[in-house]
Amino acid sequence: SVGFKAGVKDYKLTYYTPDYKTKDTDILAAFRVTPQPGVPPEEAGAAVAAESSTGTWTTVWTDGLTSLDRYKGRCYHIEPVAGEESQFIAYVAYPLDLFEEGSVTNMFTSIVGNVFGFKALRALRLEDLRIPNAYVKTFQGPPHGIQVERDKLNKYGRPLLGCTIKPKLGLSAKNYGRAVYECLRGGLDFTKDDENVNSQPFMRWRDRFLFCAEALYKAQAETGEIKGHYLNATAGTCEEMIKRAVFARELGVPIVMHDYLTGGFTANTSLSHYCRDNGLLLHIHRAMHAVIDRQKNHGMHFRVLAKALRLSGGDHIHSGTVVGKLEGEREITLGFVDLLRDDFVEKDRSRGIYFTQDWVSLPGVLPVASGGIHVWHMPALTEIFGDDSVLQFGGGTLGHPWGNAPGAVANRVALEACVQARNEGRDLASEGNQIIREASKWSPELAAACEVWKE
């Protein structure tokens, strides 16, 4: 017969290749696949590989003009999920040529762009990605990273302390700056714009930036410590976002902030490049992450969003608390915390890490624990997150019965007590409450905080 063999054919003939040996340059993905009833797992896994790479629903004439073997995604392994009927982990390898260099946006458009609406699947979740060295090297990554940040701030050997200014909406710029000053003066390292503070009618961005800068210079002069306030540069357009970052730089402040999921990866990478070029640290908030990562069987796990952020660029990122008001299992959380901070992370399924990830000296990101935490949580947080982290107490600072500055004092005293106890070899997990109680004997501010929030 003339021409090519037209018609719909099974994906698994082309895209399910259990003998395939993965290459060092491949991007590897682990998908949790829930096929529709009657769809075999091989076909579902192959369909994912096809739809997220070169495949389309029918054979097309132009297939003959490409080298499919060079460009197709391959489902190379399938395993059942323990304890779940009809769920499988499908491992897919993508050739590096399918992706634009230095573009998280393109990486996600390819891997998770179309395939999640696929009819043959009831649900699909991207659990993990292995980013090959060759691709990592096309990204700038975090503007500065953990070590450079410590050097800029001159703060070593302990976690950093932050506080989100509340009420998050409705304060005037002057009163907002006042709250910032009180917290920093009391002993915090950072204060933070809430993620939804951008530039609203009750407080325009330029006024807020000005009063916050005034607050942090005053606090710096009085405490002899370097202080920061995360000025949220997130805006409706990239141009406006950069304009805000430029103004922050002109004020001489150390750090700005961005909501990377609502702002988008393209905007985030642009801001990250600007921050590295101009010596600004970049704090990242993950507003909207639960829309993507909360469902256990559909969407994307946060560890994928965290890896993507490390590529796109950010010096801090919110990553759950393990102890506060928002959910997060301890081992899983520590898994992606390591993926953010460490240079090399071994595959470890008990911590949700499906692939060994080598970051080839891309700078690390500080995880930020934030949400419903207070002084009694301090020993656990110090133990779980270690020194390279930012602990953020919003209500846990501003809710102090004596006011903001004493709230900040209470947190700083609690932190210093925990760090000292740890350095003396005491066990924070078992003696935590004891350590806080001892410290509160000589700090009335901490004692008052201990009264308000029970253990």
From Swiss-Prot:
<feature type="modified residue" description="N6-carboxylysine">
    <location>
        <position position="192"/>
    </location>
</feature>
<feature type="binding site" description="via carbamate group">
    <location>
        <position position="192"/>
    </location>
    <ligand>
        <name>Mg(2+)</name>
    </ligand>
</feature>
<dbReference type="GO" id="GO:0016984">
    <property type="term" value="F:ribulose-bisphosphate carboxylase activity"/>
</dbReference>
<keyword id="KW-0150">Chloroplast</keyword>
<dbReference type="Pfam" id="PF02788">
    <property type="entry name" value="RuBisCO_large_N"/>
</dbReference>
<keyword id="KW-0488">Methylation</keyword>
<dbReference type="GO" id="GO:0009853">
    <property type="term" value="P:photorespiration"/>
</dbReference>
<feature type="binding site">
    <location>
        <position position="318"/>
    </location>
    <ligand>
        <name>substrate</name>
    </ligand>
</feature>
<dbReference type="GO" id="GO:0004497">
    <property type="term" value="F:monooxygenase activity"/>
</dbReference>
<dbReference type="InterPro" id="IPR036422">
    <property type="entry name" value="RuBisCO_lsu_N_sf"/>
</dbReference>
<keyword id="KW-1015">Disulfide bond</keyword>
<dbReference type="InterPro" id="IPR000685">
    <property type="entry name" value="RuBisCO_lsu_C"/>
</dbReference>
<dbReference type="InterPro" id="IPR036376">
    <property type="entry name" value="RuBisCO_lsu_C_sf"/>
</dbReference>
<keyword id="KW-0601">Photorespiration</keyword>
<keyword id="KW-0602">Photosynthesis</keyword>
<dbReference type="InterPro" id="IPR017443">
    <property type="entry name" value="RuBisCO_lsu_fd_N"/>
</dbReference>
<feature type="binding site">
    <location>
        <position position="195"/>
    </location>
    <ligand>
        <name>Mg(2+)</name>
    </ligand>
</feature>
<protein>
    <recommendedName>
        <fullName>Ribulose bisphosphate carboxylase large chain</fullName>
        <ecNumber>4.1.1.39</ecNumber>
    </recommendedName>
</protein>
<feature type="active site" description="Proton acceptor">
    <location>
        <position position="166"/>
    </location>
</feature>
<keyword id="KW-0503">Monooxygenase</keyword>
<keyword id="KW-0934">Plastid</keyword>
<feature type="binding site">
    <location>
        <position position="286"/>
    </location>
    <ligand>
        <name>substrate</name>
    </ligand>
</feature>
<comment type="similarity">
    <text>Belongs to the RuBisCO large chain family. Type I subfamily.</text>
</comment>
<feature type="modified residue" description="N6,N6,N6-trimethyllysine">
    <location>
        <position position="5"/>
    </location>
</feature>
<dbReference type="GO" id="GO:0009507">
    <property type="term" value="C:chloroplast"/>
</dbReference>
<keyword id="KW-0479">Metal-binding</keyword>
<keyword id="KW-0460">Magnesium</keyword>
<dbReference type="InterPro" id="IPR020888">
    <property type="entry name" value="RuBisCO_lsuI"/>
</dbReference>
<feature type="binding site" description="in homodimeric partner">
    <location>
        <position position="114"/>
    </location>
    <ligand>
        <name>substrate</name>
    </ligand>
</feature>
<dbReference type="GO" id="GO:0019253">
    <property type="term" value="P:reductive pentose-phosphate cycle"/>
</dbReference>
<feature type="site" description="Transition state stabilizer">
    <location>
        <position position="325"/>
    </location>
</feature>
<dbReference type="InterPro" id="IPR033966">
    <property type="entry name" value="RuBisCO"/>
</dbReference>
<feature type="binding site">
    <location>
        <position position="168"/>
    </location>
    <ligand>
        <name>substrate</name>
    </ligand>
</feature>
<feature type="binding site">
    <location>
        <position position="370"/>
    </location>
    <ligand>
        <name>substrate</name>
    </ligand>
</feature>
<keyword id="KW-0113">Calvin cycle</keyword>
<dbReference type="Pfam" id="PF00016">
    <property type="entry name" value="RuBisCO_large"/>
</dbReference>
<feature type="binding site">
    <location>
        <position position="164"/>
    </location>
    <ligand>
        <name>substrate</name>
    </ligand>
</feature>
<keyword id="KW-0560">Oxidoreductase</keyword>
<feature type="binding site">
    <location>
        <position position="194"/>
    </location>
    <ligand>
        <name>Mg(2+)</name>
    </ligand>
</feature>
<comment type="subunit">
    <text>Heterohexadecamer of 8 large chains and 8 small chains; disulfide-linked. The disulfide link is formed within the large subunit homodimers.</text>
</comment>
<dbReference type="InterPro" id="IPR020878">
    <property type="entry name" value="RuBisCo_large_chain_AS"/>
</dbReference>
<feature type="active site" description="Proton acceptor">
    <location>
        <position position="285"/>
    </location>
</feature>
